[in-house]
């Protein structure tokens, strides 16, 4: 049994790396920028911190089930960054906002409610699984729920400051490239 569990842990670790690589590839293909993809993926370590803290507070050991929760959480955590970065880009491209603090503050405030609503909905959905830790049938789902809940809380709270700050520090060049590409595309379609 120990050997099977160790093999499953190796498989989950490999799948985790593959899922992170795929998330990066999708983000890169969407934004054409490694910088923007990495800013968005900056939420993943923050989510993992919250997950580990939640597992520790719940008295849960790291398991294959919690590792599956980590993989799920990586996708959920990137969603918040995607919402914000996409909105910053749209404000610049379609509403003529220039890069700067005003764009980032406006974009962050306009996306705060949707981010909080989706995080709250997910957290509320996980509460029944977290409440009955010892009940039959929840042995597998409880660690997954604890992992996702803890990571969701930490990623949502810290992301409110991290993504805007990183975009302000490193987002100017990628945004200008996207704006130039859109301008070039308009000129080509005009002819």
What are these regions (language model features)?
Residues 1-171:
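C-terminal transmembrane helical bundles of large multi-pass transporters
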Residues 189-191:
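Intrinsically disordered, low-complexity terminal
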Residues 169-187:
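Membrane-proximal cytoplasmic C-terminal regulatory module of class A 7TM GPCRs
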């Amino acid at each position: 049994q120990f050997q099977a569990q160790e093999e499953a842990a190796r498989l989950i670790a490999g799948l985790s790396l593959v899922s992170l690589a795929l998330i990066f590839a999708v983000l890169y293909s969407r934004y054409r920028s490694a910088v923007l993809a990495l800013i968005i993926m900056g939420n993943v370590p923050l989510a993992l911190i919250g997950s580990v803290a939640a597992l520790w507070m719940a008295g849960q050991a790291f398991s294959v089930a919690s590792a599956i929760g980590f993989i799920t959480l990586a996708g959920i955590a990137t969603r918040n960054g995607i919402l914000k970065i996409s909105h910053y880009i749209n404000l610049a491209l379609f509403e003529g906002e220039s890069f700067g603090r005003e764009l980032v503050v406006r974009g962050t405030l306009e996306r705060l409610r949707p981010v909080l609503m989706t995080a709250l909905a997910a957290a509320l959905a996980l509460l029944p699984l977290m409440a009955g830790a010892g009940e039959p049938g929840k042995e597998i789902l409880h660690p997954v729920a604890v992992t996702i809940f803890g990571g969701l809380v930490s990623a949502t709270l810290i992301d409110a400051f991290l993504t805007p700050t990183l975009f302000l520090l490193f987002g100017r060049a990628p945004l200008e490239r996207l704006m130039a590409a859109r301008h070039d595309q308009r000129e080509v379609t005009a002819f």
